[in-house]
């Protein structure tokens, strides 16, 4: 939960943190197993959330977290802080690379007919995760990452190949 961590310099109002991490992709649902899964973005303020740059699975009925797999710890980035005047307003001290999971996580099958989650990140990496535990099975870099690079949206699969824009 958010805790009081100081005051905003200009307005002198109370500042609470952490802010968590944004979700800007469409969550996937596994109705048979009763699970929801999605990727998160970076934290926008310090301290960076343990759930930033992560793939998360929730129980569909209760909303309780089943597992969370963070691929990059300490990624707090706020694009407003790239403007010199804005830096005085409490920019994150981590100043991470901004490696969100913007593309929706896809549930698919391996060549051995085993279930797998496929997740693409702005880092340029694609991850294959075990859907029950969130354990990373493999990862493959398909391109250069960055704030405006890597995988933002638009992955698709035919259960034989994964199609990714970069």
Where are these regions (language model features)?
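Soluble metallo-hydrolase cores and metallopeptidase-like ectodomains found primarily
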Residues: 21-23
């Amino acid at each position: 939960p958010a805790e009081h961590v100081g005051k905003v310099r200009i307005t002198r109002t109370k500042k609470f943190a952490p802010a968590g991490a944004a979700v800007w992709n469409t969550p996937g649902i596994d109705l048979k197993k009763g699970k929801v899964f999605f990727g998160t973005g970076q934290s926008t303020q310090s301290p960076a959330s343990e759930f930033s740059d992560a793939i998360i699975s929730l129980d569909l009925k209760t909303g309780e977290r089943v597992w969370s797999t963070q691929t990059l710890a300490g990624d707090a980035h706020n694009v407003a802080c790239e403007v010199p005047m804005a830096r005085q307003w409490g920019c994150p001290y981590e100043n991470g690379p901004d490696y969100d999971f913007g593309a929706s996580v896809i549930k698919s099958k391996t060549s051995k007919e085993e279930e797998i989650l496929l997740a693409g990140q702005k880092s340029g990496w694609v991850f294959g995760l075990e859907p029950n535990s969130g354990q990373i099975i493999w990862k493959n870099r398909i391109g250069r990452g960055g704030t405006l690079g890597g995988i933002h949206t638009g992955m698709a699969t035919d259960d034989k190949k994964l199609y990714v824009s970069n």
